[in-house]
Structures are given as structure tokens and as C-alpha cells.
Swiss-Prot record:
It is found in: Secreted. Disulfide bonds: none annotated. Bacteriostatic action for Gram-positive bacteria. GO terms for biological process: defense response to bacterium. Pfam families: Antimicrobial20. Keywords: Amidation, Amphibian defense peptide, Antibiotic, Antimicrobial, Secreted. It comes from Ranoidea citropa. The keyword Mitochondrion does not apply. Its main location: secreted. This is Citropin-1.3. Expressed by the dorsal and submental skin glands. The modification Leucine amide is found at L16.
């Protein structure tokens, strides 16, 4: 769902 995408993006940003 949309929230899963948001969590994925947040994980990528957190990985930076």
C-alpha cells in the first residue's frame, strides 16, 4: 500500500 512505499522511502533516507 501507499504507507509501505512511505516506509520504504523513509528507510532509504535513513540509510543516507
Amino acid at each position: 500500500g501507499l504507507f509501505d512505499i512511505i516506509k520504504k522511502v523513509a528507510s532509504v533516507i535513513g540509510g543516507l
